[in-house]
Curated annotation (Swiss-Prot):
The protein's name: Dual-specificity RNA methyltransferase RlmN
Enzyme class: transferase
Gene Ontology MF annotations: 4 iron, 4 sulfur cluster binding; metal ion binding; rRNA (adenine(2503)-C2-)-methyltransferase activity; rRNA binding; tRNA (adenine(37)-C2)-methyltransferase activity; tRNA binding
Described function: Specifically methylates position 2 of adenine 2503 in 23S rRNA and position 2 of adenine 37 in tRNAs. m2A2503 modification seems to play a crucial role in the proofreading step occurring at the peptidyl transferase center and thus would serve to optimize ribosomal fidelity.
Lineage: Bacteria, Pseudomonadati, Pseudomonadota, Gammaproteobacteria, Pseudomonadales
Cellular component GO terms, alphabetical: cytoplasm
Top-level taxon in the UniProt lineage: Bacteria
Amino acid sequence: MTGAAEKVNLLGMPKAKLEAFFETLGEKRFRAQQVLQWMHQRGVDDFDQMTNMSKSLREQLKEVAEIRGPEVVYDETSKDGTRKWVMRMDNGNSVETVLIPDGERGTLCVSSQIGCSLDCTFCSTGKRGFNRNLTAAEIIGQVWVARRAFMPFDPNDRPITNVVMMGMGEPLLNFENVVDAMNLMMEDLAYGISKRRVTLSTSGVVPALDRLGEVTDVSLAISLHAPNDELRNQLVPLNKKYPIAELLAATRRYLSRLPDKRKATIEYTVIEGVNDQPEHARELVVLLKGLPCKINLIPFNPFPESDFRRPSMNATRRFQTVLNEAGYVTTIRTTRGDDIDAACGQLVGRVEDRTRRSQRYIAVQQVNP
């Protein structure tokens, strides 16, 4: 192999695939363990630094493989400690990744696609349309970049304790790559994050949710956002294909396979005058009866292309009270990082807009020097 483009990126390979890769080189499978630790635990991307492998193997790896993460094009920390990155992937596409610190916990919100095809009416990402799925290397690369940003650090004081697949895209529409990336998150030789602390959020691709339960036992979040099909059809068009009853039945099946008594998280974006009334909350109580779950209320974050409005905090708390009194543990998501960005999906759009303007300016200057 001669071109760098032909090299295999090892960053997204879980242990089993990396072992198979080394076998094709005529090497023992334990080499995969060594490389996993170098890449993910130590943040190394240079084979020459992997000093517990022979020089000849390192030279061979440089010929056929690479360790390549996303390029950081934006990195800023808000007053409340929230840190946001825009990372450029292959083909010049960008995604955003957000780290939310909360005491001893650090939750990283990771993207699975560039854009999104679901076109949920309250989501700014969907307005950009769908471009492509991220590779496993591009997904785990977001964790890799974020972790490296804090190196060196005390192993007992890890900056990333939780990962949520809640960024741009629908994870279950990028099934294989998302599963590979989550396996790396939970791999003891890589990030060693507990399966309870890795959460996949889905709008409800029911067949893929059933398939997910056969291959992993990460925590589950359901993007519900409405207490009935009529309203959810308007907010989440996917509901027309997989209505609420089918989605909640699949959620029950998934939870029944877990080895522990874990609950699903029900995500509910609260939109003024749309789904924020006490009667909506009471309808939700009936809908979720018997489902092991907790509820996370997300006050709508306005963005330019939407006519929806953020509800008052009083309205959101009234909604919460109905659910709490019915016995559901219900929290209101705190808006973080307002001073550096607003809703998910807006930051990357603004950065790409600036990039396009810069490219147009350069092109004009080249034509008219």
